[in-house]
From Swiss-Prot:
NCBIfam families on file: efp, PRK00529.1
Gene source species: Dictyoglomus thermophilum (strain ATCC 35947 / DSM 3960 / H-6-12)
Its job: Involved in peptide bond synthesis. Stimulates efficient translation and peptide-bond synthesis on native or reconstituted 70S ribosomes in vitro. Probably functions indirectly by altering the affinity of the ribosome for aminoacyl-tRNA, thus increasing their reactivity as acceptors for peptidyl transferase.
Protein family per UniProt: Belongs to the elongation factor P family.
Protein name, UniProt field: Elongation factor P
KW Cytoplasm (keyword) present: yes
Top-level taxon in the UniProt lineage: Bacteria
GO biological process, one term: peptide biosynthetic process
Chief location bin: cytoplasm
HAMAP family documented for this protein: EF_P
CDD domains: S1_EF-P_repeat_1, S1_EF-P_repeat_2
Length: 185
């Protein structure tokens, strides 16, 4: 059990039978009321983000998560296959377990597979990934780096906003936390 006063970003906790990671934490002290702790939590199974307020004297169970580096192999149906980089053991995760992470998976990419009580429960993506643009409007003459933006569909099916000078076939660096264009690769 861990006190809610000891929360920090990145901490994993168990709440209502689900595993959550703390994204943001704020200690709030009311003038005449009891202090509270407001947290933003991400469900590691579904990817849903919730906000929750705890009383400052509450305790919650800490979830101990193990990580193993693995390479994404392929998708079959709604199952995604990974191979451990050290033991060469294969892991199978469902689309539901991966959530939004499927938008960044490309065969051969290395990710961290998250384990809780010996079972794979999800993955942790690198901060950025390189993906190819497969569909976007053509750039017009005079488009500059400081211009506007346009939607672009990437090889995984993800659609993001990119600068006007990006063309089909360009490789772009995408921030996996915010689904945003970073730079041309």
């Amino acid at each position: 059990m861990i006190s809610v006063n000891d929360f920090y970003p990145g901490l994993t906790i168990e709440l209502d039978g689900e595993i959550y990671i703390v994204l943001e934490y704020q200690h709030v002290h009311m003038a005449q009321g009891q202090a509270t702790v407001r947290v933003k939590l991400k469900n590691l199974k579904t990817g849903n983000v919730i906000r929750k307020t705890f009383k400052s004297d509450e305790y919650v169970p800490q979830a101990f998560i193990n990580k193993r580096e693995a390479e994404y192999l392929y998708k079959q149906g709604d199952e995604y296959y990974f191979i451990d980089n050290e033991s060469f053991e294969q892991y199978v995760l469902t689309e539901e377990q991966l959530g939004e992470a499927i938008n960044y998976l490309k065969e051969g990419n290395t990710v961290s597979v998250l384990f809780y009580e010996g079972n794979p429960i999800g993955i942790e993506l690198p901060t950025t990934v390189v993906l190819e643009v497969v569909e976007t409007d053509p750039g017009l003459r005079g488009d500059t780096v400081s211009g506007g933006s346009k939607p672009a569909k990437l090889e995984t099916g993800l659609v993001i906003q990119v600068p006007l000078f990006i063309q089909i076939g360009d490789k772009v660096v995408v921030d996996t936390r915010y689904a945003k264009y970073v730079e041309r690769a």
